[in-house]
Amino acid sequence: MILDASAIVSILIGEPDSARLLQHMAEAPVLAAAAPTLLESTMVLSRHFKGDARAVMNEFVREFQIEVIPFSRDHYDVAADAFYRFGKGQHAASLNFGDCMSYAAARLSG
């Protein structure tokens, strides 16, 4: 299961759908997130936690044994393609920057 920033943030700030997300995570054989997704999540969480959220993110990655996917040139190519096919102003899906990164990670991870 590839995690995106919205799912990670939802879980860590305890949004109403976090229990459902945690259940899906528990059922997944592997959990992974692209390295840029972790940065995006940390940046959003810093607003919620009023400061440095790296420790929170690092604990989440450790606790759930999340595989961190490096973001390569191939990821860039797939993410850019996703933007031009499904990005804001291009398609009803309106994928944003983080969405395109998660899409690329999912596509290239199989």
What are these regions (language model features)?
Residues 1-33, 46-59:
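Short, well-structured N-terminal submotif of metal-dependent ribonuclease cores
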Residues 4, 40, 99:
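Acidic active-site catalytic centers that drive phospho-/nucleotidyl reactions
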Residues 27-28, 63-64, 109:
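Structured helix-beta-strand junction loops
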Residues 42, 48-49, 54-67, 72-74:
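Active-site-proximal, substrate-binding regions of enzyme catalytic domains
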Residues 67-110:
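Active-site neighborhoods of divalent-metal-dependent phosphate/nucleic-acid chemistry enzymes
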